[in-house]
Protein backbone atom coordinates (compact mmCIF):
# COMPACT_ATOMS: atom_id res chain seq x y z
CA UNK A 1 0.00 0.00 0.00
CA UNK A 2 1.01 3.64 -0.36
CA UNK A 3 1.32 4.03 3.42
CA UNK A 4 3.74 1.09 3.65
CA UNK A 5 5.85 2.51 0.81
CA UNK A 6 5.85 5.96 2.40
CA UNK A 7 6.88 4.47 5.77
CA UNK A 8 9.70 2.48 4.13
CA UNK A 9 10.94 5.62 2.34
CA UNK A 10 10.88 7.47 5.66
CA UNK A 11 12.87 4.64 7.27
CA UNK A 12 15.46 4.72 4.48
CA UNK A 13 15.69 8.49 4.71
CA UNK A 14 16.35 8.22 8.45
CA UNK A 15 18.88 5.45 7.78
CA UNK A 16 20.70 7.71 5.32
CA UNK A 17 20.87 10.44 7.97
CA UNK A 18 22.20 7.82 10.40
CA UNK A 19 24.83 6.88 7.87
CA UNK A 20 26.19 10.40 7.83
CA UNK A 21 26.03 10.79 11.62
CA UNK A 22 27.77 7.44 12.24
CA UNK A 23 30.96 8.17 10.30
CA UNK A 24 33.98 7.78 12.54
CA UNK A 25 37.41 9.35 12.05
CA UNK A 26 38.38 6.90 9.27
CA UNK A 27 35.03 6.93 7.52
CA UNK A 28 33.76 3.55 8.73
CA UNK A 29 30.03 3.13 8.31
CA UNK A 30 29.70 -0.28 9.94
CA UNK A 31 28.43 0.11 13.47
CA UNK A 32 27.39 -2.29 16.24
CA UNK A 33 23.63 -2.40 16.58
CA UNK A 34 22.32 0.14 19.09
CA UNK A 35 19.15 -1.21 20.71
CA UNK A 36 18.26 2.28 21.93
CA UNK A 37 18.15 3.69 18.38
CA UNK A 38 14.61 3.24 17.00
CA UNK A 39 15.54 4.62 13.57
CA UNK A 40 18.25 1.99 13.16
CA UNK A 41 16.04 -0.79 14.54
CA UNK A 42 13.37 0.04 11.92
CA UNK A 43 15.88 -1.02 9.24
CA UNK A 44 16.16 -4.55 10.68
CA UNK A 45 15.48 -7.14 7.97
CA UNK A 46 11.99 -8.62 8.16
CA UNK A 47 11.91 -11.88 10.15
CA UNK A 48 15.63 -11.72 10.96
CA UNK A 49 16.62 -12.76 14.50
CA UNK A 50 15.38 -10.59 17.34
CA UNK A 51 18.29 -8.25 18.12
CA UNK A 52 18.01 -8.30 21.92
CA UNK A 53 17.64 -12.09 22.14
CA UNK A 54 20.54 -12.54 19.71
CA UNK A 55 22.84 -10.35 21.80
CA UNK A 56 21.66 -12.00 25.04
CA UNK A 57 22.70 -15.40 23.60
CA UNK A 58 26.22 -14.08 23.00
CA UNK A 59 25.91 -13.18 19.35
CA UNK A 60 26.82 -9.87 17.77
CA UNK A 61 25.21 -7.64 15.15
CA UNK A 62 26.76 -4.99 12.95
CA UNK A 63 24.91 -2.66 10.61
CA UNK A 64 26.45 -1.18 7.47
CA UNK A 65 24.66 2.14 7.25
CA UNK A 66 26.41 3.02 3.98
CA UNK A 67 24.01 0.66 2.20
CA UNK A 68 20.42 1.50 1.38
CA UNK A 69 18.73 -0.36 2.90
CA UNK A 70 21.33 -0.87 5.63
CA UNK A 71 22.89 -4.34 5.68
CA UNK A 72 22.67 -6.18 8.95
CA UNK A 73 25.33 -8.78 9.72
CA UNK A 74 24.61 -11.35 12.42
CA UNK A 75 27.40 -13.40 14.00
CA UNK A 76 26.24 -16.19 16.27
CA UNK A 77 27.85 -17.46 19.48
CA UNK A 78 29.77 -20.10 17.44
CA UNK A 79 31.30 -17.55 15.06
CA UNK A 80 28.98 -18.20 12.09
CA UNK A 81 28.26 -14.98 10.22
CA UNK A 82 25.44 -14.15 7.81
CA UNK A 83 24.95 -10.81 6.09
CA UNK A 84 21.41 -9.77 5.16
CA UNK A 85 21.49 -8.07 1.73
CA UNK A 86 18.34 -6.20 0.69
CA UNK A 87 16.63 -7.89 3.64
CA UNK A 88 17.56 -11.47 2.69
CA UNK A 89 20.24 -13.73 4.20
CA UNK A 90 23.28 -14.27 1.96
CA UNK A 91 24.09 -17.88 2.80
CA UNK A 92 26.22 -18.32 -0.32
CA UNK A 93 28.80 -15.59 0.41
CA UNK A 94 29.05 -16.94 3.95
CA UNK A 95 30.01 -20.37 2.59
CA UNK A 96 26.92 -22.22 3.80
CA UNK A 97 25.52 -23.32 0.42
CA UNK A 98 26.48 -26.93 -0.35
CA UNK A 99 24.78 -26.96 -3.75
CA UNK A 100 22.22 -25.03 -5.77
CA UNK A 101 19.41 -26.12 -8.05
CA UNK A 102 17.64 -23.81 -10.48
CA UNK A 103 13.92 -24.36 -11.02
CA UNK A 104 13.46 -22.73 -14.44
CA UNK A 105 9.69 -22.44 -14.01
CA UNK A 106 10.07 -20.75 -10.64
CA UNK A 107 8.67 -21.76 -7.28
CA UNK A 108 5.42 -23.68 -6.88
CA UNK A 109 4.78 -25.13 -3.40
CA UNK A 110 7.43 -25.97 -0.84
CA UNK A 111 6.87 -29.72 -1.12
CA UNK A 112 6.87 -29.68 -4.94
CA UNK A 113 9.95 -27.45 -5.02
CA UNK A 114 11.83 -29.71 -2.61
CA UNK A 115 10.90 -32.79 -4.63
CA UNK A 116 12.02 -31.16 -7.89
CA UNK A 117 15.28 -30.02 -6.27
CA UNK A 118 15.98 -33.54 -4.99
CA UNK A 119 15.61 -34.86 -8.56
CA UNK A 120 17.69 -32.10 -10.20
CA UNK A 121 20.51 -31.96 -7.64
CA UNK A 122 23.92 -33.29 -8.66
CA UNK A 123 24.19 -35.17 -5.38
CA UNK A 124 21.66 -36.22 -2.73
CA UNK A 125 20.82 -33.56 -0.17
CA UNK A 126 22.46 -34.28 3.18
CA UNK A 127 20.10 -35.60 5.88
CA UNK A 128 20.94 -32.63 8.12
CA UNK A 129 20.21 -30.05 5.39
CA UNK A 130 17.23 -28.21 3.96
CA UNK A 131 16.43 -26.49 0.67
CA UNK A 132 16.35 -22.69 1.06
CA UNK A 133 14.26 -20.66 -1.40
CA UNK A 134 16.50 -17.87 -2.73
CA UNK A 135 14.93 -14.47 -3.37
CA UNK A 136 15.56 -14.74 -7.15
CA UNK A 137 12.40 -16.86 -7.32
CA UNK A 138 13.97 -19.91 -8.96
CA UNK A 139 17.04 -21.06 -7.02
CA UNK A 140 17.01 -23.54 -4.16
CA UNK A 141 20.12 -23.72 -1.99
CA UNK A 142 21.11 -26.67 0.18
CA UNK A 143 21.95 -25.37 3.64
CA UNK A 144 22.46 -27.08 6.98
CA UNK A 145 19.12 -27.07 8.80
CA UNK A 146 20.75 -25.75 11.99
CA UNK A 147 22.14 -22.65 10.22
CA UNK A 148 18.95 -22.09 8.21
CA UNK A 149 16.84 -22.17 11.38
CA UNK A 150 19.22 -20.10 13.50
CA UNK A 151 19.46 -17.22 11.03
CA UNK A 152 15.72 -16.61 10.74
CA UNK A 153 14.58 -14.73 7.68
CA UNK A 154 12.04 -13.97 5.05
CA UNK A 155 13.02 -16.26 2.21
CA UNK A 156 12.39 -16.13 -1.50
CA UNK A 157 9.23 -18.19 -1.14
CA UNK A 158 7.64 -15.20 0.60
CA UNK A 159 7.93 -13.25 -2.67
CA UNK A 160 6.02 -15.88 -4.66
CA UNK A 161 2.79 -14.53 -6.08
CA UNK A 162 -0.08 -16.43 -4.52
Where do the PLM segments sit?
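Nuclease and nuclease-like effector domains acting on nucleic acids or nucleotide cofactors
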Residues: 5-130, 135-162
Amino acid sequence: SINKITNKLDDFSKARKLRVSNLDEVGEQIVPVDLSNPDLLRTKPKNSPDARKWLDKGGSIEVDTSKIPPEWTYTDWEGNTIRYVDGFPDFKSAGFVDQEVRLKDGFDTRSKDFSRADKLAEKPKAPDAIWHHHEDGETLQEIKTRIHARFTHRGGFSLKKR
